[in-house]
């Protein structure tokens, strides 16, 4: 989801940081963001309307809080590590900094460079991010994936329930008015790891699901890359 109208979500994250994170004894706090295209910075050439939500965060903070966005298009938790991107981030983390972690969209891809399994390898990568952040004195925050814009007919609700168990780019029924997601258990791994390790978890999927469902099939297109 490439959102360019992120205000409800960003206000929630801003409130979280301002009320639970601020340290008066530090000159500034850095929020490092790691994830995929839904979070990543975008080129603005040619009037491109696409924005990742991490790109929009700096405008919601004072100069005491800096956002360093390392999210990249097409990356999974696995490829983010193997490409050396995580090493670049963790080498900069200081005591009191935050690391926002959001993967899942691309972990379900079938190619070996990106694929991980929820409950095993995906969870292990999330644990690594958490453990190494804490080892540097940083504070990890886990997010699950932004909802995909998949609307179906009300009569296909049972298909939606089945799709929740089998993530992937399966064939979808005819578009209707009911939103459902196809991330499957990849939505649960960040929640489970957060509970296991005592990490703050933000249910990004629920937040965006409620937003998109509330807007409906037509108005929700304004949040995605439906360019006419």
Region roles according to the model:
Residues 2-5, 26, 84-228:
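Alpha-helical cap/lid subdomain in secreted, periplasmic
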Residues 14, 38, 144:
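Ser/Thr-centric signal marking residues that sit
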Residues 23-71, 87-95, 99:
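Serine-esterase "nucleophile elbow" of acetyl-processing enzymes
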Residues 36, 70-75, 114-115, 173-175:
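Short, basic, glycine/proline-bearing loop/turn elements
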Residues 39-40, 74-76, 148:
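Short histidine/acidic/glycine/proline-rich micro-motifs that form metal-
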Residues 76-84:
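Structural motif
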